[in-house]
Amino acid sequence: MKKITLILSLLISAYGFAQNTSTGVVTLNANAGFTVQFDVNGTTDIVTMTMVGPSNVWLAVALNTTGGNSMGAGGEDVILYDSTGLKDRNLTGAQNAPNVDASQDWTQSSNTVTSGVRTIVATRDLDTNDSNDYVFTTTNNSALPLLWAYGSGTNLAYHASRGATASTLSIETIALTPEFNIYPNPVTNELSVEF
């Protein structure tokens, strides 16, 4: 019975890990130190975004874009931080500032600045039921094309610094390789585990 319980608990914990996907740290612009990471928790249905970049400029990332290195086809989900704070926006498909979503679905958990580097952590539901928001998935190896941009100051304005990259939401790799001994085998009354 103890062996069955042990095996069952290992299988359940492995299943729980398999529901989490992540992009890992995606370098958007190495010279500026601009990165983003999306961690999707399939157990809680929450996605956590960590955006890191210079503290003296506005920063933006657009999700699931189809427009290559341009302003997208229109309607793509944008997360933008500027002098007014973190905003949920969407691309218009033209050379205009992204529209502010009527529903602000990102909740900023933290916004810290250390030595000129801003780190923003924000969360939201995987599916917000907002037609302007990207629906995150826990499916392994899901493609997530990204557009990025940042300005020359903290007020949203024209920018020349922008680009596109491809990312993938993959199952997080968790290294669990502890060495241990289990004895005696077979067990009669008492099982010993030595780490």
What are these regions (language model features)?
Residues M1-S22, I171, L176:
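Bacterial Sec-dependent N-terminal signal peptides
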Residues N20-N31, T65-G85, T128-S170, P178:
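Acidic/polar low-complexity flexible segments
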Residues T21-V52, D105:
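Early extracytoplasmic/domain-onset interaction patches
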Residues T35-V40, T107-V113, I182-Y183:
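Short amphipathic beta-strand and strand-loop transition segments with alternating hydrophobic
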Residues D39-L91:
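Surface-exposed, glycine/proline- and aromatic-rich loop segments on solvent-exposed faces
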Residues T173-F195:
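Surface-exposed, proline-anchored Ser/Thr-rich loop/turn motifs
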